[in-house]
C-alpha cells in the first residue's frame, strides 16, 4: 500500500472527485478560499481515518469520544490512523501553560524530584542529612592543631529560666554548656531571665584537630546527635567570630530546623495541592476589585457617577456616601480627582474601626440613625460578588475585576517548598520564566556530576529534544510559563506540531491547517524542515497551505478549484509542482510560474506629516518603551518576526485605547503606555478579525450584513402579503408566525444517537425549507423566501438588481470575492477567511465617514494568491475613502503594496520589542538590521 485512493468524494462542495494520493510524502492541498480544500483534507480524509480508528474501539469507549460525521464518499483505501492539527482549539484553561502542553513541565518535575537540592527558604542552607562519618571527615579536614569544641544544641531561642534542664544536664555528668554564646560551668550556672529568649548548647567534647581522632570524634558526635535530636555544632575555641560548622542528621535546616518531606514530582506541579501556592491555588494571579476600573472617570463627582451604581440615582448607596461626606467633611458634588487621598482611601477601602453615623431613609420617608464602620466600596463589591447567587449581579461586578500576580508566590504558581529546590543553583520558576531558546542553552550547558548525571540522563534528553522541536517551529521566543490562553492560533498549532514530533509516531497521517500562519518568512524554512522530518519518520503529511515556499517544498500538490463554493470542488491539477504549472486552468500554477502576480503599486499615497496618530511609551509584554507613529489615511503594515511584539503593540495597546476613547467601550485595560495623540482624526475604530460571525446555525451572511431585513420588507410589501396582513416578521425564521414550528425554523431536526454522532435530519413538515406552507405561498418575482435564501450572492445580485439598497450590499459581498456563498448559509460553515470577508463587506456597504481606523490581524489567513489580490483591492478602496488601515501581516505580497511599514524586532521575545524602522517599503527594504527587509528587497524589483 503505497497510496491512498479516494473515489467519489462529495463532502460539502466536492464534485464526486477521484484521487490517488502517494503515502509517506509531503502533500500540499491548495486552491482558492472556499474551493473545498478543507472539505477534502479534514472533512473527508481525516474524518474517515479518525472514524475507522474509533470504530475499532468498544461501544463503551466510543461514547466518550466525539465522533466525526461519516463523509459522503464512495470508497477510500489505504488510510492510516489520522491526527489533525488545526488552529481552532487553543486551550481556555488558565492552568495550561506552554510547559504543560508540551509536557516539558512534566519532565522538569521529574528532574527536580530526582536530582534537586532542597534549601532552607530563610537561611539558604542546603537541607541534607549527613552521616556521622561524613561529619567526622569534615572536622578532620580542618587545619591540624586547631582547637575546637563540639556542642549539642538543647534549647534554641526559648523563653524561661530553664533551671530544670540545667540541673538534669549536670546530673548526667556534663561539665560545661554554652549559654547565649558564653561558655560556663554547669556546677554553677548563671541565673536566666524568665522573659528573655535563651539558647543552651552542651559542650560534649573539646579537642585539637589531629589524624588519630576519628574514633573519639565518632563517639562524641553520636552522643551529641542523640542529646540534641539530630543536630550538632562545632565552634572555634580561640576565635569567637569564626564561622561555626553546622551538622544535621535529619533532612532539615541545621539553623532553624525547617524540614521538607521527600521530594516527589507532584511537589512541583501547580495543578496538585502538594505543589500549588495555597494563596492563588496555583493560578499565579489573584483577582481583585480594581480602583481604576471602579472609577472610570475621575472628573465626575460622586453624585454625578464617578462610581457606577453609587450615584444620586441609587438612593440606598448614595445616602451612605452622604453620611460619609458629613463625617469626613468633603463634598459629594466635587470632582473625584479634587478630593484628598485620605477621602479616596475611606470611600474605596472603608473607615477601618472608626464608627460613622449613617442616616437611612426608607420608602415612607422615615429616617433611622445607625452607627457602624463603613466597609468601603471595593470591600462591598467583593462581599456581594462572593455572596450573591444571581449570575446577573456577578456579571455586572465582574467588570470591575482585574488580575495581578499573586503576592505570595510572585506569579510562579508554586508553594514555598517547591520554589526552594535547586538544580545547579537554579530553581524551577527561573527555568519556567526562561524563553525556550534560553532554556535550551541552559540545558545544553548543564553539567551534573556522578550519580546525579546518570539519574538525570534520560530526563535531560527528553527535555532537550522537546525544546529543540519548539525552536525548530520558530517558537524560541515563548516562555515555558506563558499561559495557553494568550497564544495565537498559529502558535498553538505549532506547539501541538512540536509535541507530535516529540511523540515520534510512525505510519500516521497528519493533516495540518496552514501551519505557517503568524510565521515570519525567516522561520518558514525551519517549519518546512520540521514537516519534512515528520515525513521522513514514515508518515503521510497532508498540509492545507497557500504559502509559496510550502508549495515548492511539496512532493505532491493537489490544486482544488477552479473557483470557490459551487464553482469549486474539482481537482484542477495534481502532481509535482512542474505538472501544476503546466496546467493553464490552475490559478495556483499561474501564480507559481509567474504568469500572474500581485503587482507593486506604481505610486504610493504619500504620508502627511501633519496628520499622524502617535502612541508613546508602550511597555506591554516585551515592548521596550516604543513610540509608534502611524500616518492618518494610509494603508500601514506592522511587520516583524514572530514574537517581536506586533500583537502587543496593536491588539493589546492601540486597539483598547482607541476603543475606550472613540467607541466609549469599557473593555479590558490597555497594556501600559504613556500617552496617545491624534485620535481626534478618527470617529471610530473597528477590528476585523477571523472570529465566526455567529456561533449558531441561525446566523448567516444575510442577517449579518443586514440584507435580510430589506428582503423581508419586500416580501411583506407584495399585494398578497398585504391582503393577508403579513408583516416583515412573518418572513423571519427566528420568531413564531411564519416559521415551521416542527423544527422551529432550523430546517433540520437533531436526533441524539448514543455511541454515534448526532444526526441532523431534514424536517419532514417543511422538508428543510424553514417556513410553514402559508408563508411559502407568498412569492416575489416568482421566488419564495426560501428560494431567495438559497441563492448564491451572485444570483441574488442579479435578482435584486432593481432594488438599489440591496444591490449595493450584495455588490460589496461580490467585491470581497464571496460570489459563491449562499445568502442563508449557516455562519458555522464559513471558514475564518470567509467570515472575515463578510465583516469587510459589511464595513464597505456602510455609508463611510472616511474617518475610521481599521485594524486587521493577518487577514491573509486562508487566502489564495487570487483572494489576496481581491482583499488588497478592498483595503485600497477603504483607504481611498480616507480611512486609515493598520494590518499586522507576514505576507510579502501585502507588505509590498502597503503605503507605510513599521517593522518590529530584531528578534522575538526578549530579543525584540523595538521599532527597527518605519517608512515606505522602499525605505524599509534598505534596513540592515531588519529580517523583513531581507525578504522584501527582492520583491520590489
Swiss-Prot record:
Compartments where found: Cytoplasm
Regions annotated as coiled coil: none
Domain of life assignment: Bacteria
GO cellular component terms, semicolon-separated: cytoplasm; excinuclease repair complex
Domain spans labelled ABC transporter: 310-587, 607-937
Record-level GO BP terms: nucleotide-excision repair; SOS response
GO molecular function: ATP binding; ATP hydrolysis activity; DNA binding; excinuclease ABC activity; zinc ion binding
Zinc fingers, C4-type class: 253-280, 740-766
Keywords, sorted A to Z: ATP-binding, Cytoplasm, DNA damage, DNA excision, DNA repair, DNA-binding, Excision nuclease, Metal-binding, Nucleotide-binding, Repeat, SOS response, Zinc, Zinc-finger
Record: residues binding ATP: 31-38, 640-647
Gene3D superfamilies given in the database record: ABC transporter ATPase domain-like, ABC transporter ATPase like domain, ATP-grasp fold, A domain, P-loop containing nucleotide triphosphate hydrolases
Function: The UvrABC repair system catalyzes the recognition and processing of DNA lesions. UvrA is an ATPase and a DNA-binding protein. A damage recognition complex composed of 2 UvrA and 2 UvrB subunits scans DNA for abnormalities. When the presence of a lesion has been verified by UvrB, the UvrA molecules dissociate.
Family in the record: Belongs to the ABC transporter superfamily. UvrA family.
Subunit structure comment from the entry: Forms a heterotetramer with UvrB during the search for lesions.
Further comment found in the protein's record: Binds about 2 zinc atoms/molecule.
Matches recorded under HAMAP family: UvrA
Designated name of the protein: UvrABC system protein A
Gene: uvrA
Amino acid at each position: 500500500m503505497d497510496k491512498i485512493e479516494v473515489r467519489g468524494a462529495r463532502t460539502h462542495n466536492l464534485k464526486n472527485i477521484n484521487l490517488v494520493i502517494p503515502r509517506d510524502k509531503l502533500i500540499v492541498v491548495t486552491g482558492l478560499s472556499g474551493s473545498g480544500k478543507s472539505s477534502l483534507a479534514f472533512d473527508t480524509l481525516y474524518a474517515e481515518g479518525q472514524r475507522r480508528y474509533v470504530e475499532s474501539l468498544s461501544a463503551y469507549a466510543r461514547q466518550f469520544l466525539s465522533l466525526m460525521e461519516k463523509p459522503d464518499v464512495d470508497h477510500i483505501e489505504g488510510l492510516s490512523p489520522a491526527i489533525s492539527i488545526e488552529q481552532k482549539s487553543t486551550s481556555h484553561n488558565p492552568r495550561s501553560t506552554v510547559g504543560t502542553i508540551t509536557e516539558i513541565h512534566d519532565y522538569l518535575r521529574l528532574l527536580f524530584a530526582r536530582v534537586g537540592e532542597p534549601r532552607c527558604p530563610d537561611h539558604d542552607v542546603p537541607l541534607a542529612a549527613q552521616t556521622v562519618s561524613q561529619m567526622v571527615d569534615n572536622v578532620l579536614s580542618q587545619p591540624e592543631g586547631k582547637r575546637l569544641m563540639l556542642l549539642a544544641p538543647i534549647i534554641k531561642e526559648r523563653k524561661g529560666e530553664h533551671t530544670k534542664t540545667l540541673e538534669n544536664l549536670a546530673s548526667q555528668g556534663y561539665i560545661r554548656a554554652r549559654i547565649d554564646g558564653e561558655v560556663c560551668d554547669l556546677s554553677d550556672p548563671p541565673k536566666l531571665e524568665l522573659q528573655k529568649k535563651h539558647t543552651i548548647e552542651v559542650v560534649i567534647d573539646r579537642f585539637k584537630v589531629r589524624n588519630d581522632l576519628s574514633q573519639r570524634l565518632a563517639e562524641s558526635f553520636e552522643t551529641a546527635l542523640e542529646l540534641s535530636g539530630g543536630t550538632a555544632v562545632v565552634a572555634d575555641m580561640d576565635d569567637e567570630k569564626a564561622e561555626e560548622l553546622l551538622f544535621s542528621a535529619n533532612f532539615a535546616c541545621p539553623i532553624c530546623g525547617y524540614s521538607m518531606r521527600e521530594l516527589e514530582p507532584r511537589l512541583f506541579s501547580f495543578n496538585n495541592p502538594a505543589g500549588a501556592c495555597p494563596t492563588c491555588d496555583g493560578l499565579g494571579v489573584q483577582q481583585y476589585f480594581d480602583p481604576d476600573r471602579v472609577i472610570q472617570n475621575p472628573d465626575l463627582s460622586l453624585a454625578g457617577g464617578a462610581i457606577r451604581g453609587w450615584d444620586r440615582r441609587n438612593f440606598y448607596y448614595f445616602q451612605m456616601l452622604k453620611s460619609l461626606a458629613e463625617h469626613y467633611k468633603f463634598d459629594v458634588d466635587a470632582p473625584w480627582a479634587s478630593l484628598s487621598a485620605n477621602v479616596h482611601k475611606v470611600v474605596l477601602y472603608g473607615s477601618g474601626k472608626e464608627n460613622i453615623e449613617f442616616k437611612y431613609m426608607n420608602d415612607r420617608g422615615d429616617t433611622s440613625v445607625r452607627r457602624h464602620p463603613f466597609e468601603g466600596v471595593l470591600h462591598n463589591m467583593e462581599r456581594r460578588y462572593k455572596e450573591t447567587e444571581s449570575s446577573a449581579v456577578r456579571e455586572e461586578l465582574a467588570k470591575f475585576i482585574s488580575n495581578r500576580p499573586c503576592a505570595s508566590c510572585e506569579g510562579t504558581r508554586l508553594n514555598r517548598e517547591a520554589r526552594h529546590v535547586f538544580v545547579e543553583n537554579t530553581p524551577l520558576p527561573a527555568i519556567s520564566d526562561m524563553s525556550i531558546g534560553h532554556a535550551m542553552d541552559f540545558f545544553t550547558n548543564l553539567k551534573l556530576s556522578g550519580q546525579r548525571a546518570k539519574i538525570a540522563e534520560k530526563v535531560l534528553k527528553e527535555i532537550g529534544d522537546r525544546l529543540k522541536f519548539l525552536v525548530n517551529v520558530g517558537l524560541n521566543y515563548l516562555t515555558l510559563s506563558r499561559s495557553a490562553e494568550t497564544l495565537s492560533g498559529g502558535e498553538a498549532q505549532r506547539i501541538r506540531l512540536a509535541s507530535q514530533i516529540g511523540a515520534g509516531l510512525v505510519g500516521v497521517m497528519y493533516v495540518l491547517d496552514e501551519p505557517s500562519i503568524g510565521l515570519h518568512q525567516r522561520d518558514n524554512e525551519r517549519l518546512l524542515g520540521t514537516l519534512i522530518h515528520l515525513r521522513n519518520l514514515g508518515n503521510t503529511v497532508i498540509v492545507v497551505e497557500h504559502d509559496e515556499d510550502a508549495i515548492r517544498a511539496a512532493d505532491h500538490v493537489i490544486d482544488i478549484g477552479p473557483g470557490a463554493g459551487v464553482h469549486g470542488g474539482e481537482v484542477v491539477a495534481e502532481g509535482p509542482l512542474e505538472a501544476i504549472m503546466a496546467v493553464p486552468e490552475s490559478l495556483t500554477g499561474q501564480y507559481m510560474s509567474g504568469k500572474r502576480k500581485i503587482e507593486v503599486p506604481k505610486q504610493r499615497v504619500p504620508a502627511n506629516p501633519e496628520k499622524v496618530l502617535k502612541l508613546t511609551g508602550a511597555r506591554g509584554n516585551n515592548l521596550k518603551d516604543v513610540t509608534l507613529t502611524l500616518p492618518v489615511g494610509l494603508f500601514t503594515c506592522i511587520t516583524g518576526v514572530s514574537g517581536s511584539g506586533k500583537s502587543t503593540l496593536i491588539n493589546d495597546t492601540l486597539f483598547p485605547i482607541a476603543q475606550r476613547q472613540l467607541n466609549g467601550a469599557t473593555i479590558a485595560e490597555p497594556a501600559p503606555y504613556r500617552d496617545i495623540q491624534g485620535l481626534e482624526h478618527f470617529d471610530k475604530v473597528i477590528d476585523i478579525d477571523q472570529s465566526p460571525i455567529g456561533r449558531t446555525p441561525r446566523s448567516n451572511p444575510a442577517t449579518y450584513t443586514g440584507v435580510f431585513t430589506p428582503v423581508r420588507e419586500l416580501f411583506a410589501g407584495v399585494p398578497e402579503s398585504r391582503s393577508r396582513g403579513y408583516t416583515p416578521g412573518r418572513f423571519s425564521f427566528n420568531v413564531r408566525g411564519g416559521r415551521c414550528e416542527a423544527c422551529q425554523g432550523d430546517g433540520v431536526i437533531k436526533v441524539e444517537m448514543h455511541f454515534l454522532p448526532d444526526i441532523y435530519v431534514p424536517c419532514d413538515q417543511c422538508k428543510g425549507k424553514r417556513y410553514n406552507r402559508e408563508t411559502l405561498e407568498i412569492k416575489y418575482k416568482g421566488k419564495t423566501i426560501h428560494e431567495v435564501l438559497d441563492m448564491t450572492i451572485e444570483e441574488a445580485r442579479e435578482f435584486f438588481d432593481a432594488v438599489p439598497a440591496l444591490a449595493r450590499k450584495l455588490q460589496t459581498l461580490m467585491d470581497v470575492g464571496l460570489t459563491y456563498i449562499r445568502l442563508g448559509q449557516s455562519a458555522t460553515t464559513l471558514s475564518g477567511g470567509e467570515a472575515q470577508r463578510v465583516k469587510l463587506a459589511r464595513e464597505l456597504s456602510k455609508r463611510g465617514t472616511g474617518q475610521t481606523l481599521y485594524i486587521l490581524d493577518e487577514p491573509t489567513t486562508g487566502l489564495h494568491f487570487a483572494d489576496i489580490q481581491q482583499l488588497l483591492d478592498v483595503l485600497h478602496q477603504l483607504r481611498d475613502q480616507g480611512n486609515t488601515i493598520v494590518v499586522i501581516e507576514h505576507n510579502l505580497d501585502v507588505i509590498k503594496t502597503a503605503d507605510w511599514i513599521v517593522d518590529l524586532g530584531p528578534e522575538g521575545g526578549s530579543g525584540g520589542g523595538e521599532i527597527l524602522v518605519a517608512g515606505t517599503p522602499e525605505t524599509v527594504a534598505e534596513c540592515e538590521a531588519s529580517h523583513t527587509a531581507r525578504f522584501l528587497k527582492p520583491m520590489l524589483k
